[in-house]
């Protein structure tokens, strides 16, 4: 059972299904318009295993230890309180479960083009050390082999057992 936070139009859920073949995927987004688009794509992409829900990644509407895996395709940096987003991911993830993430850092989204295209909070931002520390503080162990640059991080963190 998997969760994608900030699912947008559903592309991430399609990747999750094709790559990991989970029995079910819950996909959550705060933007109803994006969820409506994801609903249309769900039919076109034959994603019967997908359940769409309106919700906030800073306050996930799920029970503790509900998911085997949580996926984040560049959503945490959109959260005003990104720390609560990480805490919530850890809370809903089962022990031994994986948090699969891709995140970008301020040097990338502070670019004028990014600022024009997408809204990003400007206060309480993170870079690599803060993001990695927050994972550890919430019982999420970053696996070796993660990729990081000045602009982004890509990796998997496993919840401690």
Where are these regions (language model features)?
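A short glycine-rich, Lys/Arg-flanked "PGG" loop and its adjoining helix->strand segment in the class I
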Residues: 83-95
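A conserved beta-strand element that flanks and buttresses the S-adenosyl-L-methionine
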Residues: 71
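Class I SAM-dependent methyltransferase SAM/SAH-binding core
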Residues: 3, 8-59
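Short catalytic micro-motifs in class I SAM-dependent methyltransferases
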Residues: 74-75
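Short N-terminal helix/helix-N-cap motif within the alpha/beta-hydrolase-1
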Residues: 80-84, 109
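C-terminal lobe and adjacent flexible extensions of AdoMet/dcAdoMet transferase-like proteins
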Residues: 156-161
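C-terminal alpha-helical "lid/dimerization" subdomain adjacent to the S-adenosyl-L-methionine
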Residues: 100-155
């Amino acid at each position: 059972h998997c969760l994608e936070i900030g699912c947008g139009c559903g592309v991430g859920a399609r990747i999750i299904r094709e790559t990991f073949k989970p029995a079910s995927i819950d996909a959550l987004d705060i933007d109803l318009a994006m969820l409506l688009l994801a609903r249309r794509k769900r039919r076109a992409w034959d994603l019967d295993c997908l359940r769409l829900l309106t919700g906030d990644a800073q306050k996930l509407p799920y029970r503790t230890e509900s998911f085997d895996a949580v996926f984040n395709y560049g959503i945490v940096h959109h959260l005003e309180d990104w720390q609560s987003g990480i805490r919530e991911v850890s809370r809903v993830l089962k022990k031994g479960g994986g948090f699969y993430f891709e995140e970008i850092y301020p040097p990338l989204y502070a670019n004028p083009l990014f600022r024009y295209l997408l809204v990003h909070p400007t206060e309480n931002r993170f870079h690599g050390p803060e993001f990695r520390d927050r994972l550890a503080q919430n019982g999420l162990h970053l696996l070796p082999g993660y990729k990081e640059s000045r602009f982004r991080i890509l990796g998997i963190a496993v919840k401690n057992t």
